[in-house]
């Protein structure tokens, strides 16, 4: 922050003679005025709290008129409290309220900015049920029922200042529940601060049902959107909801070496279909990027009939005519010049409102795709290694602006992967590079690469290894090898699926993941934040239907598989929090980064702090092969490695496939075993499996 230091120094020089012998209050007053002129402010100027409440103060500075950004480059001793018995603050602006009273939380840089904190007595306003397991087995005793309800519900107290916290209710009334009769019954929770307080109550309904149906799906309360907001590496992501996207095709001075001038409209029309078609079975032969993510974001699966969380509205622009050959961009990222010129051209020539392309108002443009008029470097065989398919973040030298959004995560792709031997010459006009792109069996246009890259724009990583020959994730997932649907982890972190999280032994029936998005998570103890950024075993029933169907039948690339079977994943997505220096599961704890990835043995980011974590994969699809090792470099993930009827699983049985041999990476035993009792076909055409889940002490 040299600009600030310079301004601070000049201010001292300017007032040096005048301030000699002056009071500190005068100096503070002048410094405060300087701070005001520099546009420094806190996120809150006053706050009413109750004892035990925590909140974070942020510092903002106005860069230019009307545009602000968070300021984090301050000294550890910048924060202070005028009364630490009332409230304390750490060196990152995290405030904890302790007792009734008032104080100021001060931030001192150029002048002092304050937040006045008033701590009042806890006055209970109401309670609410934020999580309640709905189904319980017939024949359970009322005492057992009360104990299970207490362990499987979250009660939140709401105070007069609207602060909320999870509490343990003193009373759970199940007197109206007939545990020996099927039906739905009310359960009342009551809570008070002290015995003299008026009790506040809330009522929820539970169902007495068969033992095999006693688990409810749980929604993840944390998502990739929380992580992206807190991450030191990720910004400008796509969101759930409706957003606009644009593809800008780029014509270089040498593009006519690769595309006939007369075929330019073919490229634009085909890109419109590959990315945004509403009728992809006719236009493509599979899915467009639009329909793929709109279907995959149906929380309860493709057969649910519900609307997906993702709603994409997109178009392809005219060609942006560049004044350079494609070779200019072969060795460096083109975004600093070419991309910005293309974006400026698009909005100036179309007259569209740039703010319409920032659906979440984060100051970054949503879904900008640059389709360059050249084949990728692996096809040409030269050193043009930037002419590849990737999604890259915005330039960190740029500052986001809500009034005029800038480029966020954006896609850089060639036109050529849309085609194969069956249509390359017809659509492009030239045939020089057709062999690289295969036959596109069963497809009119090929969307696979573009769907994969769109996954990156939703903050999904590549799940293949770039450092070893091993194939930990498996060949047939979208973020691993451009195949079929996504893995359970990708669904959970985007809130595109809910999960069964049992905490006791049970028999559970699940449907195949494409039809239902049924996922089972096994863990010694699930985290309080209900965050998917944890370590656990995930179960899903794979079937060759839904988004898996096309690749199962046509063998794109490695191909998907045509048989039904249980897939068992070891997922370790714990976070490192830079603000606390600790491992956490909650991205809201501060600035975080995921500890693991699938490029094992090559530590980066937070892995450099915990060097031993570079051996822990983020996603690992387990083989049904007790002799298979996590370090095995065989790439032959086969259908025989799926868990079929009669198969069993425990960490002790498959210890070779875990770095810590029989334990999770966190050092804990899983204490769960799984038996696949049966796999069957449902009347609606979906598939099902009966799982026996046994929890040991």
Regions found by a protein language model. Give the residues of each.
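Short, solvent-exposed loop/turn segments at the edges of secondary structure
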Residues: 94, 242, 472-474, 532-534, ...
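Primarily extracytoplasmic ectodomains and periplasmic/lumenal surface modules that are beta-strand-rich
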Residues: 64, 123, 242, 252-259, ...
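Extracytoplasmic soluble-region selector
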Residues: 25-212
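Extracellular hydrolytic enzyme modules, especially secreted metalloproteases
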Residues: 373-557
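Short coil-to-beta strand junction motifs in C2/discoidin
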Residues: 554-566
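Bacterial N-terminal signal peptides that target proteins for export
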Residues: 1-12
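Propeptide-to-catalytic entry region of secreted or membrane-anchored zinc metalloproteases
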Residues: 211-450, 461-468, 571-697
């Amino acid at each position: 922050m040299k600009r600030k230091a310079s301004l601070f120094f000049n201010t001292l020089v300017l007032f040096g003679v005048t301030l000699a012998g002056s009071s500190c209050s005068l100096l503070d007053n002048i410094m405060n005025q300087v701070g005001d002129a520099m546009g420094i402010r806190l996120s809150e100027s006053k706050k009413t709290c109750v004892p035990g409440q925590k909140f974070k103060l942020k510092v903002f500075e106005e860069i230019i008129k009307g545009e602000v950004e968070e300021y984090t480059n301050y000294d550890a001793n910048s924060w202070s409290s005028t009364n630490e018995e009332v409230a304390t603050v750490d060196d990152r602006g995290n405030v904890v309220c302790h007792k009734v009273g008032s104080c100021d939380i001060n931030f001192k840089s150029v002048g002092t900015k304050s937040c006045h904190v008033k701590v009042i007595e806890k006055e209970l306003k109401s309670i609410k049920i934020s999580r309640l397991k709905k189904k319980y087995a017939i024949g359970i005793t009322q005492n057992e029922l009360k104990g299970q309800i207490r362990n499987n519900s979250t009660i939140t107290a709401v105070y007069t200042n609207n602060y909320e916290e999870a509490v343990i209710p003193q009373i759970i009334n199940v007197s109206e529940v007939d545990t020996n009769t099927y039906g739905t019954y009310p359960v009342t929770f009551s809570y008070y601060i002290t015995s003299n307080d008026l009790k506040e109550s809330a009522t929820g309904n539970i169902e007495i049902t068969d033992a095999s149906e006693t688990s409810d799906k749980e929604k993840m309360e944390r998502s990739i959107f929380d992580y992206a907001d807190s991450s030191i590496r990720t910004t400008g992501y796509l969101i759930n909801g409706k957003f606009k996207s644009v593809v800008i095709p780029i014509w270089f001075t040498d593009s006519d070496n690769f595309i006939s001038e007369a075929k330019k409209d073919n490229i634009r029309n085909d890109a419109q279909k590959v990315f945004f078609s509403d009728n992809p079975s006719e236009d493509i032969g599979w899915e467009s990027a639009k329909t793929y993510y709109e279907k995959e974001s149906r929380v309860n699966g493709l057969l649910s009939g519900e609307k997906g969380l993702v709603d994409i509205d997109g178009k392809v622009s005219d060609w942006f005519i560049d004044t350079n050959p494609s070779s200019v961009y072969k060795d460096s990222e083109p975004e600093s010049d070419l991309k910005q010129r293309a974006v400026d051209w698009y909005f100036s020539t179309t007259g569209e409102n740039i703010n319409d392309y920032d659906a979440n108002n984060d100051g970054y443009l949503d879904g900008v795709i640059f389709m360059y008029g050249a084949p990728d470097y692996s096809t040409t065989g030269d050193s043009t290694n930037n002419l590849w398919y990737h999604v890259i973040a915005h330039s960190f030298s740029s500052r986001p602006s809500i009034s005029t959004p800038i480029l966020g995560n954006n896609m850089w792709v060639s036109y050529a992967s849309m085609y194969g031997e069956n249509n390359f010459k017809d659509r492009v006009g030239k045939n020089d590079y057709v062999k690289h792109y295969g036959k596109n069996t069963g497809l009119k246009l090929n969307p696979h690469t573009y769907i994969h890259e769109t996954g990156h724009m939703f903050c999904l990583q590549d799940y293949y290894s770039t450092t070893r020959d091993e194939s930990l994730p498996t060949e047939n997932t979208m973020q691993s090898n451009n195949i079929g649907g996504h893995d359970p982890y990708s669904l959970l972190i985007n809130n595109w699926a809910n999960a069964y999280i049992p905490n006791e032994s049970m028999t559970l029936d699940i449907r195949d993941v494409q039809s239902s998005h049924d996922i089972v998570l096994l863990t010694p103890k699930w985290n309080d934040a209900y965050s998917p950024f944890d370590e656990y075993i995930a179960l899903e029933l794979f079937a060759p239907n839904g988004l898996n169907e096309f690749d199962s039948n046509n063998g794109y690339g490695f191909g998907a598989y045509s048989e039904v079977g249980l897939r068992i994943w070891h997922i370790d997505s714990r976070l490192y929090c830079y603000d606390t220096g600790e491992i956490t599961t909650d991205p809201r704890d501060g600035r975080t980064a995921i500890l693991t990835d699938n490029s094992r043995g090559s530590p980066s980011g937070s892995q450099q702090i915990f060097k031993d974590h570079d051996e822990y994969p983020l996603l690992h699809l387990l083989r049904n092969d007790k002799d298979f090792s996590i370090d095995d470099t065989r790439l032959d993930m086969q259908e025989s490695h799926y868990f079929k009827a009669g198969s069993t699983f425990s960490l002790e049985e498959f210890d070779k496939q875990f770095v810590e041999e029989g334990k999770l990476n966190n050092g804990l035993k899983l204490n769960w075993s799984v038996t696949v009792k049966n796999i069957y076909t449902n009347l609606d055409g979906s598939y099902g499996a009966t799982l026996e889940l046994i929890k040991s002490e």
